[in-house]
Amino acid sequence: MDESKENRKIETKELVRQYLKRKYPDAQFSDIDLDFLVRYSVKKEPSANTILKSIGNDIQTEQAYYNAHPAVKAAKDDLQYIYGRFSQKQKDYKNVFNGSFEAFLAWWCEKTPENGIRHCCYCGVDENTLKDAFKNGLVISKKPSFSGELQIERKDPDGDYCDNNCEFACVICNNAKSDMISAEDFTKFFVPGIKEYWEHIKEKL
């Protein structure tokens, strides 16, 4: 492996380490775990069993590895979920983070607080409240894309999906702002009412 590829591998491994530390603060991930997650869930090498064999893991199969390391299975699923969000944006828009999942993951990690709980960039509602509101039927939508997941918002709707133009936003804020209102005007004129709405929802949870 040439030096530039090795440096990128180290950078990606450190990025995954930082994200998992925030999302799974009580879990322990070995270097082998991190190597596996980088190659399988980020680099998208096709065979988990081949990766495990090449990195010197003594467990023979992917499922046995997950059985012995449940935190790795959870982390793998989490990283694949993030990749799914990236892939969906790529289908719908051009030039999403310059086509780099690693750049997207770096942005995702940057926007994930130390406690692992993300918030809407406008009204501040946390993703746990958002998920609970949908789960309990307090917020309902017929549109599948309107869910308890935080959406990826472009502050400037005419700009690209990139690290300095994207934030997480709740479905209420993202839908209300659309592409007609500037972030500044939306924050000034609409956000106070949306904050009151979420406080009303929290009282019912």
Which residues does each predicted region cover?
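Mixed-charge, low-complexity interaction segments
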Residues: 1-83
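Short, charged surface segments at domain edges that flank catalytic/cofactor-binding sites
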Residues: 67-127, 158
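DEDD superfamily 3′-5′ metal-dependent exonuclease/proofreading module
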Residues: 99-101, 116, 133, 200, ...
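A detector for short metal-coordination/catalytic motifs
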Residues: 111-113, 149-150, 160-205
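Histidine-centered nuclease catalytic patch
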Residues: 121-168, 177
